[in-house]
Amino acid sequence: MQIFVKTLTGKTITLEVESSDTIDNVKAKIQDKEGIPPDQQRLIFAGKQLEDGRTLADYNIQKESTLHLVLRLRGGTMIKVKTLTGKEIEIDIEPTDTIDRVKERVEEKEGIPPVQQRLIYAGKQLADDKTAKDYNIEGGSVLHLVLALRGGY
């Protein structure tokens, strides 16, 4: 089947795939066509970041679906966000990213809107307009995610 991959520059790439193909396979096909190494690719479908080991079928990606390709810049920092259930989400950030941007990354992976997220690091609640660097958040840092219920303070 054919699927489309749209880049940030607005270019659309057409790929021939099977629904049993993994996201890894799709990234390899994008590398063949565009020369972008898979470790620099992030694929988004229906607002979610696609994980390498999963298949197109797992995400219900069908013929003529459009995926969005976002480039992960070199020098990105991998941090972890731990949820109340104990689940750890790995997120790639830049030191200059605002906390709001970090929350957007959490939303891409978990579907939790940024307004419902409170991020805690080193015992402090993080302000949206500050950067990861402002809080000395580095590779391997673990942030804690607390959900803010509507109407709560």
Curated annotation (Swiss-Prot):
The protein's matches in SMART domains, at most eight in alphabetical order, are given as: UBQ
Q: Which is one Pfam family of this protein?
A: ubiquitin
Instruction: Give the matching InterPro entries.
Output: Nedd8-like (IPR038738), Ubiquitin-like_dom (IPR000626), Ubiquitin-like_domsf (IPR029071), Ubiquitin_CS (IPR019954), Ubiquitin_dom (IPR019956), Ubiquitin_ubiquitin-like (IPR050158)
Cross-link (Glycyl lysine isopeptide (Lys-Gly) (interchain with G-Cter in ubiquitin)), chain numbering = 48, 63
Q: List the expressing tissues.
A: At 13 degrees Celsius, expressed in roots and to a lower extent in old leaves and crown. When transferred at 4 degrees Celsius, levels increase in leaves and crown but decrease in roots.
Q: Provide the cross-link position: Glycyl lysine isopeptide (Gly-Lys) (interchain with K-? in acceptor proteins).
A: 76, 152
Q: Which residues form the signal peptide?
A: none
GO MF: mRNA binding
Ubiquitin-like domain ranges (all copies): 1-76, 77-152
Annotated propeptide span(s): 153
Q: Where are the transmembrane segments?
A: none
Tell me what turns on expression of this protein.
By cold and PEG, but not by NaCl.
UniProt keyword annotation of Repeat present? yes
| Origin: domain of life | Eukaryota
Q: Name one GO cellular component term.
A: nucleus
> What are the UniProt keywords, alphabetically?
Cytoplasm, Isopeptide bond, Nucleus, Repeat, Ubl conjugation, Ubl conjugation pathway
- Does the keyword section mention Nucleus? yes
- State any further remark: Ubiquitin is generally synthesized as a polyubiquitin precursor with tandem head to tail repeats. Often, there is one to three additional amino acids after the last repeat, removed in the mature protein. Alternatively, ubiquitin extension protein is synthesized as a single copy of ubiquitin fused to a ribosomal protein (either L40 or S27A) or to an ubiquitin-related protein (either RUB1 or RUB2). Following translation, extension protein is cleaved from ubiquitin.
| Purpose of the protein | Ubiquitin exists either covalently attached to another protein, or free (unanchored). When covalently bound, it is conjugated to target proteins via an isopeptide bond either as a monomer (monoubiquitin), a polymer linked via different Lys residues of the ubiquitin (polyubiquitin chains) or a linear polymer linked via the initiator Met of the ubiquitin (linear polyubiquitin chains).
Indicate the family of this protein.
Belongs to the ubiquitin family.
**Descriptive protein name:** Ubiquitin-NEDD8-like protein RUB1
Its gene? RUB1
